[in-house]
């Protein structure tokens, strides 16, 4: 699509209530639209960038043996009660809702519990291992303060990966492969020689 055909516009100024520089620049350039604090809509240019980044990550995850899934954003109360992470006094970022029959649900802020249950139902023997399962999924977090632009929001896409191995040694090989994959991702998206403290010291 030609830039002249875009319905979106650029702006000289960002919304007055936007205090984060990252979001201010993206709004002014016509990449995202601010719906409310911590909630942004990706416009055609922003979505194009997002999809390219996801594509690069997907290629690298598949290259190390990852299998992509897509778990439900709606999660059962009973599942999270088993790990004592449903109570708001323990985890205070839930967006909770209820079905018409009274069943309580939450919009997933993470997917450890659902993924653990899923894998436990499909892995019956060491012969089923190893497994690397990953997803790109919308997450929801009821943040008290959402003033960091697109860096800390209430609704966002997260790529998460879960591994099951036959031994600590196999798991260590997974980790080394994934570490190398992320370094390649950083380089491919233009971040260059990114080395966080965690990457340098693990």
Model-assigned labels for residue ranges:
Residues 1-202:
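TRNA-recognition modules of translation machinery and tRNA-sensing kinases, especially anticodon-binding
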């Amino acid at each position: 699509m030609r830039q002249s055909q875009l319905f979106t516009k650029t702006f000289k100024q960002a919304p007055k209530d936007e205090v984060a520089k990252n979001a201010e620049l993206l709004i002014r350039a016509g990449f995202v639209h601010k719906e409310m604090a911590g909630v942004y809509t990706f416009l055609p240019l922003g979505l194009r960038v997002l999809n390219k980044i996801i594509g690069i990550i997907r290629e690298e995850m598949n290259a190390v043996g990852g299998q992509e899934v897509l778990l439900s954003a709606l999660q059962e109360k009973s599942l999270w009660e088993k790990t004592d992470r449903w109570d708001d006094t323990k985890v205070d970022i839930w967006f909770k809702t209820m079905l018409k029959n009274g069943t309580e649900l939450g919009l997933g802020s993470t997917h450890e519990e659902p993924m653990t249950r899923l894998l436990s139902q499909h892995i019956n023997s060491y012969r089923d291992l190893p497994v690397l399962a990953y997803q790109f999924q919308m997450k929801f977090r009821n943040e008290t303060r959402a003033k960091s632009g697109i860096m800390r929001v209430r609704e966002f896409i997260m790529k998460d990966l879960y591994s099951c191995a036959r031994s600590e040694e196999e798991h260590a090989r997974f980790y080394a492969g994934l570490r190398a994959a992320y370094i390649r991702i950083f380089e491919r998206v233009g971040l260059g020689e990114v080395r966080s403290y965690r990457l340098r010291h693990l």
